[in-house]
Curated annotation (Swiss-Prot):
Reaction catalysis annotation: dTMP + ATP = dTDP + ADP
Species for this entry: Wolbachia sp. subsp. Brugia malayi (strain TRS)
Source lineage: Bacteria, Pseudomonadati, Pseudomonadota, Alphaproteobacteria, Rickettsiales
Function: Phosphorylation of dTMP to form dTDP in both de novo and salvage pathways of dTTP synthesis.
Protein name: Thymidylate kinase
Binding site for ATP: G7, I8, D9, G10, S11, G12, K13, T14
Amino acid sequence: MFITFEGIDGSGKTIQSELLANYFKQIHGENNMVLTREPGGTDFAEKVRGILLKDSIDPVSELLLLISMRYEHVKKVILPALKKGKIVICDRFIDSTIAYQGYGLGVDLELIRDLHKLVKIKYPDTTFILDIDVQIGLSRAMDKNKYEEMNISFYNKVRKGFQEIAINEPDRCSIITEIEAKDNNQVHVEIVNKVTATKPVLLRK
């Protein structure tokens, strides 16, 4: 099972991915659970991550770099774990590229999707999208990067992108709303309840 967490900066997706990973470890054991992230996930991608999040480059060049890192990540980490029957949780994946590079920076959405199809990138089985007010999210963001220098309009476009992804792919995506009004445990419980309702097999030892 491949699960991803998505949302704008400060939405709490990183802590929620960690909480769900720890929850599954208690059920299935640490060796059957893989927690990873993007940009990153491999030695190569982690080295490039710092450059990607700090240096400004052309949006299409950025897209190509992200996809090359993702291909490496899927081939070396995600698919091998899934083939062994492990649960894989990833903090950001394809949807972040669609929302940030597509909706936010204006890269053609079909180009983004076609390039992923070209290199046969696997889509997640389940995606949790954490929706939060833009200004509150940015005030909470801990991992400062170049995107946080963008204006509110940029982040509103990114947020809209995530919302539209959730609407267009309801079988894969579950959107958690009003994050700003909930504490981390409340959000975690809501996510576990959604897993219980849609993927009960994950809760069996």
